[in-house]
């Protein structure tokens, strides 16, 4: 059976996301896969490429043929060089810089503006006094009494006695 390592498409229009999948060569692009060994998101900066190196090495060793786009991804991650015994097995994958936490950014902005935070970053919301006063001034609605008494239970006995 001819096995290929190929990309199966996910995502929305104009936002492609791919799975790196091992599948029979005769299956369609998004058809049934034998195994999913990674994912690829080209729209992120830098592109997200996650490939399980151990499983990729296994499938290459048993004769699976990568498609051209997958071959480029394997060269970027260094899996193809490792399989072929070529130099550069560490790959040239770009890593995104870690994002600073929002609290750190907030405190840094406060420090730059006034010289330091005067209060906590998170404070519970309080209701405005105008709304509280309006609710207190409004009388509570009284439940309306029905004009005709219900004829059931004890009330039926009371009306029968009178």
UniProtKB/Swiss-Prot annotation:
Q: Tell me the first and last residues of the signal peptide.
A: none
Gene Ontology, cellular component aspect:
cytoplasm; plasma membrane; small ribosomal subunit
**Disulfides per UniProt:** none
GO molecular function annotation? structural constituent of ribosome
Q: Where is the composition biased (Basic residues)?
A: 124-134
Sequence segments annotated as region (Disordered): 113-162
- What Pfam families does the entry give? Ribosomal_S16 (PF00886)
Q: Which InterPro entries match?
A: Ribosomal_bS16, Ribosomal_bS16_CS, Ribosomal_bS16_dom_sf
PROSITE patterns associated with the record: RIBOSOMAL_S16
Q: Which GO terms describe its biological process?
A: translation
Query: What UniProt keywords apply to this chain's record, in alphabetical order?
Result: Ribonucleoprotein, Ribosomal protein
NCBIfam families named in the record: PRK14520.1, S16
Q: Identify the HAMAP family for this entry.
A: Ribosomal_bS16 (MF_00385)
Record family assignment? Belongs to the bacterial ribosomal protein bS16 family.
**Protein name, please?**
Small ribosomal subunit protein bS16
Give the gene symbol: rpsP
């Amino acid at each position: 059976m001819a096995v290929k390592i190929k990309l199966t498409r996910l995502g929305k229009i104009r936002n492609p996301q791919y799975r790196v999948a091992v599948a029979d060569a005769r299956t369609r692009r998004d058809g049934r896969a034998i195994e999913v060994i990674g994912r690829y998101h080209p729209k992120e900066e830098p592109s997200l490429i996650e490939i399980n190196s151990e499983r990729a090495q296994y499938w290459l060793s048993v004769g699976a043929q990568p498609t051209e786009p997958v071959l480029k991804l394997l060269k970027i991650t260094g899996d193809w060089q490792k399989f072929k015994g070529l130099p550069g097995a560490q790959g040239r994958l770009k890593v995104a810089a870690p994002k600073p936490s929002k609290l750190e950014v907030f405190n840094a902005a406060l420090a730059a503006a006034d010289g330091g935070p005067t209060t906590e970053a998170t404070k519970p919301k309080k209701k405005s006094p105008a709304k509280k006063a309006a609710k207190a001034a409004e009388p509570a609605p009284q439940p309306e009494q029905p004009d005709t008494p219900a004829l059931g239970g004890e009330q039926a006995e009371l009306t029968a006695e009178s």
